[in-house]
Amino acid sequence: MDRLTTGRGGAPNGRWEVAALFGFVVAPLTGLAAVAAWAKSVRSRLPEPIATHFGARGEADGFGDLSGTLVILVAVTVPMALVMGLLGARRRFPRILRRSLGPGSPVFVGFMAGMIADTLVPQLDAPTADGVVLQSTWSFVGTATGLAVGAMVAIVLKDPSAPKAESAPDPSLPRGPRSEPVRTDTSTGMKILAAAWIAVTVASLLLSPALFLILGLSFFYIVQTYSVRLRVDDDAVRFRALIGESIPLATITAAKPTRYDWGDSGGIGIRGVEYPGRPGNEAKRIAVASRSGEALDIDTTGTNWTIVVPDGTADALAGDINARLDRLHG
């Protein structure tokens, strides 16, 4: 059984989430098709050849035909949109991963469609493409529209309900009193990287608005676990990074302290990881990792989690969860 997929042979409400399919796949590709159709409709108003490449300051320095430009647009955009969109809509993946990946589809499509508009609008009715300067207005509009669509769809995503755990955790696991909420900050190296990324992103605005947008949007994945807060409540274990999740207490089967090494587990952030060397725990998990270090394994009847916590707190958090589960199961 693949615990990353929540152990379901088939999701009770279907394999796909309809709202996500529409917002992450259908709507973006429909918008892309509309932009491509508009581009073909204004072909007669464009110079021949058209400007297809621009220098650092936005001046045209490469030329080609409209058909080739649209083919490249479709060849680059559609596969990326399908990969991100379908991953975001597939119910077999936990909601937190779908919220991370799915919105990237409308954002990317909006950016690429905006780039086409920014390329062609300055050339409408121009006798020649020489001297044309690339705009950036439509790239920002397309990106903002895609971001709004992606965010709205991400908010309404749902996880199929996992069954309740049938018994209390193994008696050998730690028990303890109620724990305090904790916060884990990323490593110094990642803080330096984030600061450098911000500096480069701001500087790129002077060179290329398109590069600024790409770097700015990528920043989400750099800092999505910059700071992670976790607390144990009577009804759920709740954590929050840039996005968060609640793990219902009734679905938890065990909590135990462990360690997370980003070098062995695919990095930091929110990701699917696998620990083939752990006896009895070879299945995939969702890691919420701001750095390497002490972590908390939370096993459930659905998705399993590994959440990095401040050093010295994993035992107390695991003990609190297991003690609450003992009381829950009487």
Q: Model regions: which residues?
A:
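Non-transmembrane, membrane-adjacent beta-strand/coil modules in membrane-associated proteins
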Residues: 239-306
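Active-site and channel-lining beta-strand-loop segments
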Residues: 38-70
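Hydrophobic alpha-helical segments
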Residues: 81-133
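N-terminal membrane-targeting/pre-transmembrane regions
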Residues: 2-17, 121, 128-141, 146-202, ...
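Conserved beta-hairpin
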Residues: 215-256
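Alpha-helical transmembrane segments
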Residues: 24-32, 62-77, 134-152
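Alpha-helical transmembrane segments and their helix-start/interface "positive-inside/aromatic belt" motifs
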Residues: 14-30, 94-104
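Transmembrane helix interruption/hinge and helix-loop junction motifs
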Residues: 203-212
